[in-house]
Amino acid sequence: MPEGRHVAIIGAGAVGVISAIEALREGHRVTLIDPGEPGGEQAASYGNAGWLSSHSVIPPAEPGIWKKVPGYLMDPLGPLAIRWSYLPKALPWLIKYLLSGWTEARVEKTAFALRDLLKDAPLLHRKLAEEAGVPELIERNGVMHAFPSRGNFDNDLGWRLRKKVGVAWLELNADEMRQREPDLHPRYSFGVVVEEAGRCRDPGAYVAALANHALASGAKLVRAKATGLKLSGNKLVAVVTETGEIACDAAVVAAGARSKQLTASVGDPLPLETERGYHVMIENPETGPRSSIMASDAKMVVNWTNKGLRAAGTVEIAGLEAAPNWKRAEILRDHLFSMFPKLPRDIPASRIKTWFGHRPSMPDGLPCIGHARASRDIVYAFGHGHVGLVGSARTGRLVAQLLSGKQPEIPLAPFSPTRFL
């Protein structure tokens, strides 16, 4: 592959801006294309929980999850909810989702692939933050998982597989939990701390800083919505936008949940779906955790950010266009109050902020990282689901390696877009 190509990167989220930085490092010219502000409220990265969980190697679907589907359909406020009106459209994706976690062997295969992608992610993000002049936004201080009992932990397939792929952790009994987290509800009597993991103090500000760093390093930003990719034979000639064409030698599709239309325009109808996520944030709370915590029973991450105490999590399958169900954010708020009983229940509404966005998700829990079938000038980098922020650092490196014709630093076969084609 020739060096010094003009690369158009569609999407200025975490994956897109880091891909831009790494492509510039390889000597390419870069144009970022996005209608929104990098790191703005419209972006999935903005509302991210802020966990840099290099141990998040377990896909959402696990053996036996099919038994829970009726409950997901009946409970619009559960950890995973499926809107009836969207079910016909989501059904093909849901079937692939269930099959991907049908056996433990399949889940284990996914875990090994994700471990390759996520290993050392907090360190990679720290280096990027230092380059961008915002080292204070990335902390590598470990994260805690809280369980009601040791039995809940022992019966969790995910932790057996994490051990298998090389994740280490520190185990805490009830007394040690109280010492570390005195304000956490005493119903949590067992915990594990994954010391290799970290957190981002402000995901939106981090992505904005990375975008500014890319621009300062020579990238350009075009505020437009990309609608397609223009080929001449097997050669890419332009990215098509609502305001015109942008000539380029190569393109990266990193448009998150809106990547599906772009891949279809070049003959790759990929099964990308949006897992809608919510967060609630309390500004200047009176109490809270000392560290970042995931509550196993609530399926919710609680993390301190520069803007306040943020609780994020759960999944809603309802597509890109449906209005948000803000009761799901209220459930997160109630879980937060339950986890930390000393939080006042009369916090003014003006101090409680809610948000919702779209996780771009492939049914098997693995992103698409690789070339389009129609042209090796097109690189796909989307579909990270729950590991978009943490996985973006290595994904950007892989994108730059693919653009330059270099050997990728990890095996990319598990992430190949052709696995569903």
UniProtKB/Swiss-Prot annotation:
GO terms for cellular component: cytoplasm; extracellular region; peptidoglycan-based cell wall. Its EC number is 1.4.3.3. The keyword Lyase does not apply. It catalyses: a D-alpha-amino acid + O2 + H2O = a 2-oxocarboxylate + H2O2 + NH4(+). GO terms for molecular function: D-amino-acid oxidase activity; FAD binding. Belongs to the DAMOX/DASOX family. Catalyzes the oxidative deamination of D-amino acids with broad substrate specificity. This is D-amino-acid oxidase.
